[in-house]
């Protein structure tokens, strides 16, 4: 399995914000978001091949009881289901962070953190028009999102760049044809720097208050800035 990095930090996003966690970041992604904050795991994937026992040994070096399987897109990694099972067999709480473009296929986890991508994620022309078409065709898979929501404890987390994005989100939720509690929908300001996030935080928080969604910050930027291993 190609692993970009394994590190111990504080969960900075979502309903488990503040929880000490070991992050296992797989390398490789089937999308190319233009604002991606981990291009070394997506646009230009890099990493080392590691076996499941090697990954588990590194996880066990840390005192945390929460593990986050992230990427890139962890659901396209070979042996991801076996890794998830092995992590949970050791008694860890496992969160899988995914864009929800790949069906769960029975994978085990304690929290599915689903982050479907909006129109604002469309890549620029760095990789030419082919990737833009691939990204747009794949970024929103309502049947896949529905399978995750119906089968797992979940949170739906959307990256918001402008107020109009909220209307797009509400349209996506409507197309799921499910009763999604608003407190399980998290809106997060787009930005790879603290300044960018703060610039969007105040109006997004007000939108969350008005619509009943949950606001989520990017605590890791407050604590560590935009750097790897955090």
Enumerate the predicted regions with their spans.
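Canonical Radical SAM [4Fe-4S] cluster-binding loop centered on the CxxxCxxC motif
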Residues: 1-54
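The start of beta-strands in P-loop NTPase/AAA+ ATPase cores
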Residues: 20, 65-66, 92, 110
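Short aromatic/hydrophobic contact patches that present stacked aromatics
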Residues: 23, 66-68, 155-157
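A secondary-structure boundary/capping signal
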Residues: 25, 70-71, 98
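Structured loop/turn residues at beta-strand edges in well-structured enzyme cores
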Residues: 31, 62, 107
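Residues that line or immediately flank small-molecule/substrate-binding pockets and catalytic motifs
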Residues: 40, 71, 116
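Glycine/small-residue-rich loop that forms an oxyanion/phosphate-binding "nest" at active or ligand-binding sites
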Residues: 45-72, 76-78
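Conserved AdoMet/S-adenosylmethionine-binding subsite of the radical SAM
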Residues: 56, 75-230
């Amino acid at each position: 399995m190609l692993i970009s990095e394994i590190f111990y930090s504080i969960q900075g996003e979502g309903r488990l914000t503040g929880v000490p966690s070991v992050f296992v970041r797989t390398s490789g992604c089937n999308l190319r978001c233009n604002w991606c904050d981990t291009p070394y795991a997506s646009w230009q994937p890099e990493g080392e091949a590691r076996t499941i026992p090697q990954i588990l040994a590194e996880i066990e070096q840390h005192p945390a009881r929460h593990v986050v399987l992230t990427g890139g897109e962890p659901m396209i990694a070979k042996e991801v289901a076996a890794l998830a099972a092995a992590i949970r067999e050791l008694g860890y709480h496992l969160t899988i962070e995914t864009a929800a473009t790949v069906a769960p296929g029975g994978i085990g986890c304690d929290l599915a953190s689903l982050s479907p991508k909006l129109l604002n994620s469309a890549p620029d022309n760095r990789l030419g028009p082919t990737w833009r078409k691939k990204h747009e065709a794949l970024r929103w898979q309502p049947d896949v999102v529905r399978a995750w929501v119906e089968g797992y404890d979940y949170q739906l987390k959307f990256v918001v760049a402008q107020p109009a994005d909220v209307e797009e989100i509400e349209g996506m939720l409507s197309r799921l044809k499910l009763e999604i509690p608003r407190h399980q929908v998290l809106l997060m300001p787009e930005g790879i720097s603290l300044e960018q996030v703060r610039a969007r935080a105040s109006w997004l928080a007000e939108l969350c208050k008005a619509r009943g969604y949950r606001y989520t910050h990017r605590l890791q930027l407050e604590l560590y800035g935009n750097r790897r291993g955090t």
